[in-house]
Swiss-Prot record:
Gene name for this UniProt entry: ndhH
NCBIfam families: NuoD (TIGR01962), PRK06075.1 (NF004739), PRK07415.1 (NF005649)
Species lineage: Bacteria, Bacillati, Cyanobacteriota, Cyanophyceae, Synechococcales
Keyword Transmembrane in annotation: no
Keywords attached to this entry: Membrane, NAD, NADP, Plastoquinone, Quinone, Thylakoid, Translocase, Transport
GO BP field: photosynthesis, light reaction
The keyword Repeat is assigned to this record: no
Superkingdom of the organism of origin: Bacteria
GO cellular component: plasma membrane-derived thylakoid membrane
Assembly behavior: NDH-1 can be composed of about 15 different subunits; different subcomplexes with different compositions have been identified which probably have different functions.
GO molecular function, one term: oxidoreductase activity, acting on NAD(P)H, quinone or similar compound as acceptor
Reaction(s) catalysed by this chain's protein: a plastoquinone + NADH + (n+1) H(+)(in) = a plastoquinol + NAD(+) + n H(+)(out); a plastoquinone + NADPH + (n+1) H(+)(in) = a plastoquinol + NADP(+) + n H(+)(out)
Sequence similarity: Belongs to the complex I 49 kDa subunit family.
Protein name in UniProt: NAD(P)H-quinone oxidoreductase subunit H
Subcellular location: Cellular thylakoid membrane
Length: 392
């Protein structure tokens, strides 16, 4: 007589499993096919990003920050310069603010496309991955035309503005992309949203209540998919988002399907913001020269008027004034924050990163208890984590 084993099994998922989206390890306790418990093990991609910041000037540190969330590197640059600008009281020219918003919203679209493709591949739909990468290539080409780099290390944001202005013909290419992309999002929806297999894999799976989401400190699409109307672009009024007409994507269900819907709507809204920003792009300087010219007096080169090659010159180091500040932006994954402490030195005394992925990942064990193993893949994919920012 063959006996059926009834004791629980401990299963290691990752850190090299393709569905883990990075070096995440999950210790999963199984009772047959049902998940009893789950313990995330993180830290495999820890690179000491906070300590590196405390030993670098802001200009030296900017090339590093793209490696936090390497799927959407511009947000890391934005929060890095915003933290210093707030502490030092540096203003940003209107044109520079518009350029920043254009880049950030294009980055949001690339992030959601990079989430959409692998998420559906995890669920068994391979073709949408190729579609998502096709559209994403357009944006990476736009990034390359401005910054010289495609995915990460754009190194575009500067304290007081941006590194370079847009090249000739870029705005037309950007508007062409927006006109091309909006119908493509509708195509994705027709292809995927009402697919019966897709619906059964996501509807009611990994649901979390509005109050639980707030208690866990969730942010971004994870929070808005629970019916909480909270978007830092509307709440904090940073950059020039108030100049544009757009809506916050909110869905009340709190499950994996709601998170998918939020991100799809966000891609549409980001596209609308980019269109409005490009059409209303103001003239003027693309950076606050005072932020670069912190050295006063005749030694300074910045007052000689040859601003044509300003981005080619090494930026003047300036001392971060005494004080502390917490600055946050609405990244593609949620609230990305920096707590900075300055002590009148060229390097910050303390640089604390508040990554959205790290906080959102903590809710995973609660979401997958009692679910099947196949559901775990869908739930983890719906959270949208990048291990670079989780481990820092």
């Amino acid at each position: 007589m063959i006996e059926t084993r009834t004791d629980r099994m401990l299963l290691n998922f990752g850190p090299h499993h393709p569905s883990m989206h990075g070096v995440l390890r999950l210790l999963v306790t199984l009772d047959g096919e049902n998940i009893v418990d789950c313990e995330p093990v993180i830290g495999y991609l820890h690179r000491g990003m906070e300590k590196i910041a405390e030993n670098r000037t802001v200009v030296q540190y900017l090339p590093y920050v793209s490696r936090w969330d390497y799927g959407a590197g511009m947000f890391n640059e934005a929060i890095t310069v915003n933290a210093v600008e707030k502490l030092a009281g540096i203003s940003v020219p209107r044109r520079a603010s518009y350029l920043r918003v254009i880049m950030l919203e294009l980055t949001r679209i690339t992030n959601h496309l990079l989430w959409f493709g692998p998420f559906l591949a995890d669920l068994g739909a391979q073709t949408p991955f190729l579609y998502a990468m096709r559209e994403r290539e357009w944006i990476l080409d736009l990034f390359e035309a401005v910054t010289g780099m495609r995915l990460i290390n754009n190194n575009y944001f500067r304290v007081g503005g941006v590194a370079v202005d847009l090249p000739y013909g870029w705005t037309e290419k950007c508007l062409d992309f927006c006109e091309y992309f909006l119908p493509k999002v509708d195509e994705y929806e027709r292809l995927v949203t009402d697919n019966p297999i897709f619906r059964r894999r996501l509807e009611g799976v990994g649901a979390i209540s509005k109050q639980d989401a707030i208690n866990w400190g969730l942010s971004g699409p994870m929070l808005r998919a629970c019916g909480v109307n909270w978007d830092l672009r509307k709440v904090d009024h940073y950059e020039c988002y108030d100049d544009f007409d757009w809506e916050v994507a909110v869905y009340p269900e709190g499950d994996c399907l709601a998170r998918y819907r939020v991100r799809m709507k966000e891609m549409r809204e980001s596209c609308k913001i980019v269109q409005q920003a490009v059409k209303a792009l103001p003239g003027g300087p693309f950076e606050n020269l005072e932020a670069k010219r912190m050295l006063e007096g005749p030694k300074s080169e910045w007052n000689k008027g040859d601003y044509q090659f300003i981005s080619k010159k090494p930026s003047a180091n300036f001392k971060i004034p005494k004080g502390e500040a917490y600055v946050r932006v609405e990244s593609a994954k949620g609230e990305l924050g920096i707590y900075i402490v300055g002590d009148d030195n060229v390097c910050p005394w303390r640089w604390k990163i508040r990554p959205p992925g790290f906080v959102n990942l903590q809710v995973l064990p609660q979401l997958i208890r009692g679910m099947k193993v196949a559901d775990m893949i869908a739930i983890l994919g719906s959270i949208d984590i990048i291990m670079g920012e989780v481990d820092r």
